[in-house]
């Protein structure tokens, strides 16, 4: 590769970085699909929720992610639309599930706070048959589940009020 070609590649890299920065300014969610699923949930979604709902406390627990005075133990399940499958759901380990669905194209959040006691209404699929009881997965895409979810939709403000026990 010639020195001129190396310089041109450096220019292109600089232009790409500049365009990516502009894209993220226009749509802060534009890069979310680049995260692995686990990293997206733990490194982006959970801190994003905590920043908007400070009454939650992050915990290092196997069965739930947050705790609060108003809601107790909350397990967060995050998806980037159009994907809507949630895995490793253990309704016996938490008081609520917070399904956080992020529309990366429209830069919108859709939050659903489902009491764990109502989780089985969604007819989830048993995820493991190796003796691990109470572990489920499900797609939130089905018409029946979308109808069920509507009653659990919350805004960040509503979520914060409930977490704070107000």
Feature map (PLM): residue ranges:
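Nucleic-acid endonuclease domains
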Residues: 1-72, 77-166
């Amino acid at each position: 590769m010639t020195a001129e070609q190396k310089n041109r590649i450096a220019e292109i890299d600089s232009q790409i970085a500049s365009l990516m920065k502009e894209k993220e300014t226009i749509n802060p969610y534009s890069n979310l699909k680049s995260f692995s699923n686990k990293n997206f949930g733990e490194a982006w979604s959970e801190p994003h929720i905590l920043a908007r709902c400070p009454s939650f406390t992050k915990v290092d627990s196997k069965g739930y992610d947050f705790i609060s005075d108003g809601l107790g133990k909350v397990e967060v399940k995050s998806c980037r639309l159009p994907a809507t499958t949630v895995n490793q759901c253990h309704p016996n380990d938490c008081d609520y599930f917070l399904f956080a669905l992020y529309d990366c194209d429209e830069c919108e959040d859709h939050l659903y706070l489902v009491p764990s006691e109502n989780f089985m209404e969604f007819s989830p699929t048993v995820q493991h048959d190796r003796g691990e009881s109470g572990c489920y997965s499900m797609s939130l895409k089905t018409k029946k589940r979308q109808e069920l979810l509507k009653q659990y939709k919350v805004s960040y403000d509503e979520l914060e009020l409930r977490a704070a026990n107000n």
